[in-house]
Amino acid sequence: MPNSLAAVPSMRFPFLSLSLAVSIALAGCSNESTPPAASTAAPATTAKAPVKADARNHDESSYAQPQLVVIKDLALDLKLDFDAKQIGGTATYTLEWKDKAAKQLVLDTRELSIAQVQADDGKGTLAPLQFALAPADKTFGSKLTIEAPNQPAKVVITYHTAPTASGLQWLEPSMTEGKQLPFMFSQSQAIHARSWVPLQDTPSVRFTYSAHVTSRPDVMVLMSADNDPKAARDGDYSFKMPEPIPSYLLAIAAGDVVFKPISARSGVWAEPAMADKAAKEFEDTEKMIGAAEKLYGPYRWGRYDMLVLPPSFPFGGMENPRLTFATPTVIVGDKSLVSLVAHELAHSWSGNLVTNASWKDIWLNEGFTTYVQARITEALYGVEMAEMEREIDQGDLLAEVKDMAPADQALALPPLAERDPDEALSQVAYVKGAWFLQFLEQRFGREVFDPFLRGWFDDHAFQSATTDQFVDYLNKNLLDKHPNTVSAAEVDAWLKQPGIPAFAAKARSRSFSIVDTARIAWSGSGTLPSKQVTGEWGTQEWVHFLSGMGATLKPEQLKQLDETYHFTGTPNGEIAMRWYPLAIRSGYTDARPAAGEFIERVGRRKLVLPIYAELLKTPDGIAFAEQAFEKAKPSYHPITTASVAEMIAKAKAAPPAQPQPQPQP
């Protein structure tokens, strides 16, 4: 929802914590433009203003009305047009009408051009239906209202996307690893699926789907479905997803990719130059699947494959079922960042199998997944490894909540009325959610808690759930059966109160005490820890070493670190995102050119936004950031582009910041 230390000694552990390797925190992205009114085969009225959130009573982020009618199956027949940067074709919906009085089908769209809407009687006869496409809301897109007085069992929509669709990125060959063929991919979470398919774009609705996709014959097309590793690259592809999924898990990609098997049910797709390296990096995937199955039951999605995308992918990973999307920034040669796989794999139970019913309950996806990820880590790599990850995560969370509104610090968020769900997501959902489950585990013991959690997954498989439903399940299946172990007030403190409860046990890593001692010794004497000490450090220890530095250091101190560990120019994004901001704040100018090259080359939001944020605090930094952004923009994903553009605009509009105090020699 997605980097080792290139110049630092080899890693002792191949996992990295969520806050380091699996930041799939969603980017706030909305398209300001309003698409032209679509032509109508059967004219209908057009709304005169965007429909506001108070008209959406089930999910504040969707116009859909699933209490009246739901999509049960989606059949796509699409053509990919790389020249026009568009997807076009038809979407056929099999519907279940829940209300006999319902006369309309309402769908979510964003920047879609709707050519026609038809009712399908199932016998080959299509009849036009009236529809109205409302003007666009900048966050939620356009409400598509289809008049369906006879409640047809199937509806067919002919449409095409805009080149600026927020959920799609089209890359020129020069932006790929191979430099020969174009590449495209989707990112549907949280509410971007509506930019490439008209849908009930809410996680409360699940549907099966099939797809027929045509493209130029020299690219391979893949979807979050049953991709055939032996499929011919011929420009004509068919897919089927037999398990019901929510709209945000609908995914497509096309490019010059080849397949490398890892196990009988798992493998990796990547550009040819990256394929062998990716397969080697992810070779422990089958062990991870086995560890998760032992804890939480069988993997229910058939295959678990991964697709390594170009560097412009804005996240670390995306848990698209049967085809996890992954950033290439985790392919570093030492397996130090493959916790991304553990996190996205964990979503196969928490998120994909049991899904938050709306984005205000996203902790049910991300908190559970972070907890499951930690259990996989512990099963494969030991208790101390998991404890280090928890301590890093918890420290990052405690720092983040200091600047958050109290309501945003609760796990059960208030309704997201008129609020982009991307912007509402924070480490609270991930880390506080996992911390709550760890608290329950500690109180009840694993012999009780593990069967409870597996029961939650089994009893709600292929369903969406709310926080209230989880609390009911918790009461009936855990608290009531084991009275006087956890109180309702304690549960309330986790779910509805800001901050972390005072009774929460914090993670404590023994390994980090050695790192702290080494850092303190260097700060006092100027003597860096010996290779005998650092040779035993893994990625977590190095990140902890850098994260514990003060806000600024003397330039000569940074130079000493740089000459010893070669942080400047590292391809390790996790180090880069910590090193470059520290260098910029401290006036260590030797690092600035490499910082610029890094943000021009990498489009992953987690890695580049902290560097932009630090640059934008000074006038010369703003100028430098603008120059780098102009070079990077052609290869950035629309989500990253929107985030950086907003940051720059705010920085230029703000009064000049006071200069950072520099350490005195």
What are these regions (language model features)?
Residues 33-42, 51, 114, 239, ...:
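Hydrophobic alpha-helical and helix-loop surface patches within well-folded domains
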Residues 99-101, 121-125, 150-151, 229-235, ...:
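Short, glycine- and charge-enriched coil/turn segments that flank and shape catalytic ligand pockets
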